[in-house]
Structures are given as structure tokens and as C-alpha cells.
Amino acid sequence: MKFTLSWLKEHLETEASVQEIADTLTRIGHEVESVHNPADGLEAFRIARILTAERHPQADRLQILAVDVGESEPLQVVCGAANARAGLVGVFAAPGVYVPGIDVTLKIASIRGVESRGMMCSIRELGLGDEHEGILDLPHEAPVGQSYVEWAGLDDPVFDVAITPDRQDCMGVRGLARDLATAGIGRLKPLAIPRVPVTDAAPAEIAIEDKEGCPAFFGQLIHGIQNGPSPEWMARRLRAIGFRPTSALVDITNYIMFDLGRPLHVYDAGAIKGKLTARKAQNNEKIEALNGKSYDLDPSITVIADDQGVKNIAGIMGAEKASVSGSTTDVIIECAYFDPAAVSQAGQKLGLASDARIRFERGVDPAFLNEGLQIAARMVLDFCGGKATQAVTLGEAPSAVPVISYDPSYVTSLAAMDVAPARQREILEQLGFAIDAGWRVRVPSFRRDVSVVADIVADIVRIEGLDNVPSTALDRGDGVARPIATHGQLTERRVRRAAAAFGMNEAVTWSFISEKDANIFGGAFWKLANPISEDMKVMRPSLLPGLLTAAKRNRDRGQSTIRLFEVGRRYLQEAERPTLGLIFAGERMSRDWQYGKSQNFDAYDAKTAVSAMLDSVGMPVEKLQLLGDAGDVYHPGRSGRLCLGPKNTLAVFGEIHPAILAEFNMEGPVIGAEIFLDALPLRKNSGQLRQPYAPSMLQPVFRDFAFLLPKDVPAADLVRSIAGADKNAIVEARIFDVFTGETIDENEKSLGIEVMLQPAEKSFTDAELQGISDKIVAAAAKKGARLRA
């Protein structure tokens, strides 16, 4: 919602500064997104008159102008605007002036051999709009040499305020002025309802068939108008909020909508055949709307139509065929009340948005129909002339308003604020509420958001100021334990920290994905009944689709190394499961003079990361089983799963299958992993503190072994067996070499394993070392391995 300071002062008598107004609006619940003064940076632009315009000798599209800028001698300016001509009064920028619309500081220049000492400017070049087909053409009487900002009244700050969906009454400047006045920023001026003289001529012919979609339809016919430009003050305000002035009739409806929050529509009466009727659309009816698009209608949509067809989608947008133009002489002004739900559903079905729709679907003031029509008719008569017929009022808008039994003590009990009853009454009455002696509060017709006591308290609190609500801790009842994090919360916290420590970036992706992607990653189990779009139709069965999309977006923007993780929920048929998802894409190591060409991530990077995350939550990583069959998402030969026992899968990892990467239009390799946090067992609490680490005073001993092992036996099984051969002496066992080739059997592989032995109280003797080695060989033999000769 945008408005200017001068516009606000039409309704609010105030001397408050721009900053005070902005701060107060935000304090009472209307967040000010920006305040912009169009005059900033335009102080140096002056009004100038073109004395002569001659063709440039070296360019057909350029003219050499002699420009009077109010100085003793005219200045020479080279100009390419098609409308530049002798006698035109426009806006001039001298050398040294910064032109914001084109981001250029002017200087004296030679253009095709002719010196130019400045520039005649267009609306776009001034940064005041998008019009750029020609230079500004001001009224002939505009004073040459005067500041354009001063003459045009541009020193008028523009506020941009975010109005919450429940406050339709503040979708007009007057509603905001009412709130500001209540907050002590000024005095609300009374709204004058003008008198409209009428003739005895036949009134507008209107009717209502769809009383649910259009409970009330008011209309007034005005004859003999001349639809010229709107007054400069109105055009200036509309331009300031981003509207291009079109004609007086169109500008009047837009102005009243933003001024009073009352949408209207004006029809060219000459294009109407028969009665204007509010009815349901018929099957296969179409409308060519004012936005230039065609829409197919159906009987669920309320329309305004004549004998020839639809002339308006009720509360949303009119038809091109009944629109007003410069040749319009007779008009019908529509001021109606349309059902908010019907307008909202029609707009969603047609995919059609408008400023009128926003206001109607939030609910306009049903008690302001006649007043809105009178104000519009008076403006038409004042700006366009003509004679008005008697207004026609059909139907009745909803008139029931809540009457709420209230007690001033509710503010203390609900908001912990101490506000005197007299002050509460003052606030409510200034906001438009009526209060009798027994504190029965009658809600104003324009406040659809107020229906219970808590709503009244909320109004009082926001006007008094949330800053005045004391910060008070809630009382903790006897026997109520202090809040502690659950096991699941602690687990998520630990793995999140571990992932960040591993050098990964946390991502937050949508929980909704397309049905196509869901089927790729396990199935579309939870479908939304009313999805935002087809791409957000299903609750994700895996975190990988969102992470893959994020990785692709980053790669498309030039990122060569991507490490992403997310902690979130997967939605499966039986339940939702907390999960940690990981994605590695691109280069693990960039090309380097020392290491040569770049190296991409592989499945081992994912295994290392997963192991680190599991270790952070106390899982015995060295005891986990590494199995294949990670699922169809992964490359069958470059993936695996870590299990605590054969049935409890803690994590899956590996290279994403090329077919899935093709679905996401990505090039591999891309590495992924998921850790199933709810599968992690609870850590047993012994009740004792962990003993501090005490490093041995003795040197460790390293022994290397080379074993021949059947190819179908996982290397991890052998390593785990060796590590358990003598738990008192063996600290670690790890693979340092893998070999297959002609010198060994084709069904075997050679593994080089380094074993770290740590003596406790004294160094190992040769006999002890030999005994440990024998245990290692025996443990390996249980897995089918033998020492390589």
C-alpha cells in the first residue's frame, strides 16, 4: 500500500515528521517497507523552453535546439526526441548534473560534430516512471528557469506500507490515517460526503440475479461527460504510487480505491445493451479483459453482464468492450458488494489478480456503498461535467456487526498491561467502535477482523505500544520440570554441528516436491489436497531431491565445489522420519601445480562424512557393518549402507545413479547420503563421567600384513575381525593397499593392512608380538583370508 505525505494529510491533520509517521505506523502494526522522496537528486533540474529546433546536418534523427533556461543566453542542446519542437516547455539538465534514470553525469559533449551543453529529459530519465517515448511536455505557462521539483510538487515523500491480510480497512489512506490519529500522531479530519444533484432522466438499468455472489448492486448513470485528463494533483499522486494516469474516469476509480479502500467500476453506457445484471457466468462464456487477455468462464463465477455478454468479472476486472475512452459521453458507475469468498475463488480459478480483487476478497466496508457512489459521481461531475440521474440501489449488503461484551480488565489478564478504562474507551472510539455504558462494544462495519474479546485487546495493545508490555517470565508450577532437549533434538543438534565442522553448508529446501520426483525417490505417499503448484504437490520421501535441485542451482551459477547438508523430515507411508541429507558435487580438489588435475568427489567422501556424523552422536563406527544394496537411487557399484546389525540401517551413501542425474539435468559424479536419525539407538547413560584421555608413555608398534582374500568378501569384514583379535593390544587396523592382477588368483584380492599396537605398562616382548600376530592371522582366517607369501 503506497501513498504520499500530502495525500495522508488530506485525512490527517498533523505536524509530525516523516520519520515519526513511519515509526508510528510500524509500532502499531503496519510495517513501513520504505520511504522514498521523488525529489531526492532532482534539485538541479530546471524548467526550460525550446526556442528553435533545426535538423542536425549529420544525423536525420537528431535536432539542434536553442533552449531558454532562464539565463541571459540560450543554450545549444542536441536532442533525439521525436516530440522536440520549438515552443515546447520541458525539463533541462545542465552539464555536471547527475541523471538518475540513465545513471550518467552530464558533461559538455560533441555529438556528430555539434556541441551539446545539456539535455532535455524524459520521465524515465528523471527516474519518475517508465515513459520514454519523448521528452517531458509541460504546460506552456510553466515558469522557465524555476526548479522542476518545486513547480511539480515532487517534494512529497512516498510511503510503502505492508498491510496484513486481516486489515482490509487499512487498504486505503483514510484507514491508516485513522490508526495514526488514534496513536496520537494527529487528528482525523471528518470525511465530507458531497451532494450530487440529479435530473429526472431515466436512471441506470441494473438487476441482481446472483444474490449470494452480489448481495448489493448500486449504480448511477451520468450523461454528457467529456473524458479528458484528470487534474494534475490527482495524476501526481497516482504517478507517485506507480500508476500511470489514463483518463479522468479511470483515474477517479483508482484514486477512490487507494484513498478510501472502495473499489468501483465505470462502464461506457453507450456500449451497454439492455440491463446490467449481476449473475452467474454461463458455460463457455468468455471475456476479453482490460489486461488484453481472454478468460473462459463457468457458472461458479459471478459476473456483471448485459444482453450481449459479460462486461465485468465481479470484483476483479472489467471487459475491454465496455471500457471508457476519450469518446465516451455517458457512463454508469458501479458500486457493489461482492461476496469475498466468491471473488477469491474466481480469481484463483482464472489466475487473475487485481487491486480490486485484493480488497473485495478481504472484505470491503458493506456500509459504505452509497457514500462511495456519491463521492465518485461528484468527482465525475467536477472533472468531466455532465448530468447525473437518480442513483439505483438494489439489494442489501451484510449489515450484522458483532456486539461484544467487554471488560477493561481483559487487557491486564490477556496482555499484562495496565491501561485505564477511560483510555481504553478513547482508543476504541477513535478506531470507530461504539461503546455503551455497560461496556458492550459494537464493532464498526469496516472491521471484519474483530469478532471476540481478544481482538479488542489486541487493538488496545498495539495502539498503546507493544514496547509497554512488560517482559515477564511465565510462572513454573510446583513439580513442573525445567524444559530439556529430547534425545531427538540433541541428536539433530550434534549432527548439524558435525556437518558444519566437516566444512559443509546447511541448506533449507522445500518439504514439497513434484509427484514425478517423489516417485523417483521412493513414492508419493503424502499428497497435498490444495498444492501451490504441480512442482510442490507431494511431501518429500527423501531429502535428496531438494538438495540436488539446490546443488544444480549453485553449479549453474558457477560454483565448482558444493558441499550441502540438510536436517529435516522425510515423509513415508507409515510415518515421517528425521533425516540428515548430504550432497557433494563438483571438485573435491581444484587443479594445482603440485597435485595436477582436479579431483572430483567420490563415494568414499560420503562414507567418511557419514562416519564422522555418526561418530559425533556416539555410534561405534568401527563396529558398523558395511553392506551393499543402497537402493535404486545410487550407482549399484559405488554405494553402500552402514548397519548396526543386519536389519537396522543407519545410513546409505554413494554416487547418485546417472539416470536420476539425467532427470535433474545434472552431470556427474554427484555424491549423496542420508542418515536416518530415528534409527540411531539411545546412548546408555552410565551415570559416570567420562574418564579423561591419558596418553600412553610408551611408543606404539606398527605391523603390516598382506592377506589374500576372496573377492566377494567385504574388506571391512576383514578389518573388523583383525581389530577384534586382541582388544587389549590392537588400537586400530586400516587398509593401506589393495591389489589385483596376474600374480594372484582372479577370484582373490590382496589387501595390505596396517595394525597399530599400543603397549600399556611395558613394551612388548618379541614373544608377545608374535602371539598377537598369530591372533591376527587366525582372526583373518575366519573370514577366508590367508597370509600372502
Swiss-Prot record:
Where in or outside the cell is it found?
Answer: Cytoplasm
Superkingdom as given in the UniProt entry: Bacteria
* Domain FDX-ACB, first and last residues per copy: 696-788
Say where the protein is mainly found.
Answer: cytoplasm
Q: Has keyword Signal?
A: no
- Sites binding Mg(2+) sit at D449, D455, D459
Q: Which Gene3D superfamilies match?
A: 3.30.56.10, Bira Bifunctional Protein, Domain 2 (3.30.930.10), Ferrodoxin-fold anticodon-binding domain (3.30.70.380), Nucleic acid-binding proteins (2.40.50.140), Phenylalanyl-trna Synthetase, Chain B, domain 3 (3.50.40.10)
Q: What is any one GO biological process for this UniProt entry?
A: phenylalanyl-tRNA aminoacylation
Q: Which UniProt keywords apply?
A: Aminoacyl-tRNA synthetase, ATP-binding, Cytoplasm, Ligase, Magnesium, Metal-binding, Nucleotide-binding, Protein biosynthesis, RNA-binding, tRNA-binding
**Ranges for the B5 domain?**
399-471
Instruction: Identify the Pfam families for this entry.
Output: B3_4, B5, FDX-ACB, tRNA_bind, tRNA_synthFbeta
Q: What is this protein called?
A: Phenylalanine--tRNA ligase beta subunit
Give the organism's phylogenetic lineage: Bacteria, Pseudomonadati, Pseudomonadota, Alphaproteobacteria, Sphingomonadales
Q: Which gene encodes it?
A: pheT
